[in-house]
Amino acid sequence: MPRGIVVKYRSVLLQPRNIYMSLAELLRNTVTESLSKLYQQPFSDKDFQVNQTKPEFEGDYTIVLFSLIKKLKKSPEAAGNELGTHLTTVYPHLFSRYNIIKGFLNLSVAESYWVELLQKNYTDGNYGKQPAKGERVMVEYSSPNTNKPLHLGHLRNNFLGWSAAAILKANGYDIVKTCIANDRGIHICKSMVAWQLFANGATPESTGMKGDHFVGDYYVLFGTELKKQVEVLIAGGIEKEAAEKQAPIMLQAQQMLVDWEAGKPEVIELWKKMNSWVYAGFDVTYKRIGSDFDKTYYESDTYLLGKDLVEFGLKKGVFFQKEDGSVWIDLTADGLDEKIVRRKDGTAVYMTQDIGLAVKKYEEYQCNKSIYVVGNEQDYHFKVLKLICRKLDLPAADGIFHLSYGMVELPSGRMKTREGTVVDADDMIDEMVNVSKQKTEELGKVKDFTSDELKELYDTIGLGALKFFLLRVDPKKKMLFNPEESIDFQGFTGPFIQFIHARIKSILRKETAAPAAHFTTPLLPLEKELIVTMEQYPVIIEQAATDYNPSHIANYVYAVAKTFSSFYSEHKVASAESEEKKQLRLRLCQMTANIIASGMGLLGIKVPERM
């Protein structure tokens, strides 16, 4: 029995399935039915345990007999022989032989099952995907601030959100992709003040800069100027904390925020203009990385939402008011703490806004689930959000789910913004494309491409390397991004998988499988291993959707590519030892290429036809 990736997904193989009945589920159903017929009493799949057979024993799946023998009052040997004989006799197309070792019934799957699986699915480009479930899921991701360009952390967020949405869609869910633009607040005003002070009327057009980078430079400039002014105040005997509040440029930003909230025309005009520059820049980046949204919410439109819910919560007794007029909720009985929902001056806090927006989104889309793709520094916030919504008996409450993820770091350390040392998304993508160009040219296989084809190829490989590296890691884990490692054509990388796909396509351009074929020659070990690995694809998609975890897809597709690489290094296709073997292997090639293209597609990664 093939090992490695199969064992990794053992627990999922034995879960309830979808329209693609996995071998594991088929086995459980068959064994349950057989036990009931053999012993004339009811059985369920909870009466026995199924595992994959350990490498040192013969077989594919193992039935643990100990729980059965108590019910049957038979020895393991007797029960195993009766069940094994029944299965191999009544279902010869499914089980070819069995053996019993110390209370374990090891079953070997009939080779005809694997061949039939290949024959049935090798041309199906949608293999593993499910029909509509009639349930809607919202995935909110990206959520940028409109005072700076996207950075490396945003890339992980975008890739994770887009991929999670694609995986859920493949499982039959109706998907709504949304984004919340954080387009108001003191951080936005800082860029606006700096532009007023230092830009001299400069624009992205006049400087030849991308709009989000242009505005981001003024946010950095604000931080630089603030630091200078604070140092002057400290030198004059003012404490640092007071100096940071009293610095003239900070006071200007605070006044800018007051003027914005008051609707001062010239401030609103500047705010709209600078935001439009940023959105134009975002659009270029989003198009480049493939991110898209069905609806964008703007904080400037939603920040007042939820205020009526505070009054509702007070009347309901969920919230309480302190002497200073501020409104809170006491969550200490739930293992949390007290949380403010309205300041003493009557203004809303972020939590209040999020409660209001959750209600708005539910009213607009009636989603069964609302997934927030946000970094793990907000874990507590979303625990509180869901809990408050539940205590308010809001219909949106049960569907709230925080898809938390860890920070992305580089060897140089954690990313920062105020100091201007952030790793911009555009710069990172450019670097990856340049590295892909260098690596591809080193292979010496680019002479048959036009310049336009090469540009597209370098973009595809570079962006594919970046996406795969960021998605191959469990979202919950903090990760270290290594550009050089991510583009290794021989490693656990996107380019390796892309190369395998291109190699298969090269084979299929020269030869295609004949429509009709009959196979009698036994499968060789690597042929069987490849089919066994591909059989799991529907289960892996389902697992990735259940866990909201694209790394399951990334790990699986790599396993498929690696298994094919081992197979191809040992066995010829076009010049196979017989026509029967040639037809079988062409089918293996076609199904492998389809699964790689499908799986990488769920990660948002293109696979070239040629490399």
Describe every region a protein language model picked out.
Residues 20-115, 131-611:
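Non-catalytic interaction-recognition regions
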Residues 7-20:
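Short, Lys/Arg-enriched N-terminal segments with co-localized hydrophobic residues
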Residues 113-128:
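Secondary-structure boundary elements
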